[in-house]
């Protein structure tokens, strides 16, 4: 089909783009939820390629991330140690949850769109038992902000106790416990600043947040984006800064070699030990 041909073309493009130095240049694979078995086969086809570091599940509107039909995708990802990466959308498909209810103000809609898309996916991953069934799975949201995450995790943790019948009876951990286990990650947005970032670290720990530049989009602080975040060190702490700038991403992403190793034949695995 045309859709599958476009997916294949994208993956060839990513492999070619990253081939300049696949130790340092990484990409993600698109896994269409409309055809889970084809998506799983595609993951296995590319699983040993060094450029591949994460998978973006592309879900048709109305299909929840915990739908049983998607299990082949999670199985293939778990086998390859590939994490889930989520990026929300706004005015283009797949539209954000509630996109029909914006009341006409684009600024308000865009403020809500990326966050709510991330919140919904994160919540369903955490309360569905997916992380229990697939012990290598990790999940992250990117370009969705980060200040919302502690409130969402705390509230979600309380709600699965308040509405016990809404989650699997054999769910092994609470959302907060999955965070503390190193299964949840979130990329920062620089406009939220060092104080907000410190608050997230104080509540959830320093193993969650990851640096993000948003290059080459308009929200990037280019050419000062890296120096801008490094300057937050006195506020968030130097150890937390090191993890934010590199360590947490190295744990989250599937890395088949050490990006900081000068050799081209390294066999090191990602920092999470898997």
How would you describe each model-predicted region?
Residues 32, 214:
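Conserved PLP-binding active-site segment of the aspartate aminotransferase-like
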Residues 1-2, 37:
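Surface-exposed, active-site-proximal loop segments in enzymatic domains
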Residues 3, 7:
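Acidic, glycine-rich flexible loop segments
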Residues 18, 22-24, 31, 37, ...:
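Catalytic pocket-lining loop regions of alpha/beta-barrel enzymes
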Residues 12-16, 20, 41-45, 128-129, ...:
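Mid-to-C-terminal alpha-helical segments outside catalytic/metal-binding sites
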Residues 1, 110-114, 232-233:
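Short coil/turn segments at secondary-structure junctions
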């Amino acid at each position: 089909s045309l859709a599958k041909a476009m997916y294949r073309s994208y993956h060839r493009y990513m492999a070619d783009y990253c081939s300049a130095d696949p130790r340092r240049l990484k990409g993600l694979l698109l896994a269409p939820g409309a055809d889970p078995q084809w998506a799983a086969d595609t993951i296995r086809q590319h699983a040993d390629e060094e450029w591949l570091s994460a998978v973006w599940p592309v879900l048709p509107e109305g299909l929840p991330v915990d739908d049983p039909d998607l299990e082949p995708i999670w199985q293939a990802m778990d086998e390859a140690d590939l994490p889930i990466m989520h990026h929300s959308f706004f005015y283009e498909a797949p539209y954000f949850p509630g996109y029909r209810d914006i009341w006409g103000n684009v600024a308000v809609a865009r403020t809500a769109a990326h966050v709510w898309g991330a919140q919904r996916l994160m919540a369903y991953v955490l309360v569905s038992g997916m992380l229990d069934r697939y012990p290598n799975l990790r999940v992250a949201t990117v370009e969705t902000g980060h200040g919302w995450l502690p409130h969402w995790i705390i509230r979600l943790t309380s709600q699965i106790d308040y509405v016990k019948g809404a989650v699997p009876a054999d769910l092994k951990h609470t959302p907060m416990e999955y965070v503390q286990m190193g299964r949840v990650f979130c990329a920062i947005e620089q406009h939220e600043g060092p104080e907000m970032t410190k608050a997230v670290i104080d509540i959830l720990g320093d193993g969650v947040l990851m640096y993000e530049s948003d290059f080459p989009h308009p929200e990037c602080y280019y050419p000062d984006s890296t120096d801008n975040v490094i300057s937050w060190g006195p506020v968030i702490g130097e150890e937390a800064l090191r993890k934010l700038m590199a360590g947490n991403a190295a744990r989250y992403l599937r890395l088949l070699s050490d990006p900081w190793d000068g050799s081209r034949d390294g066999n090191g695995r990602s920092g999470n030990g898997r």
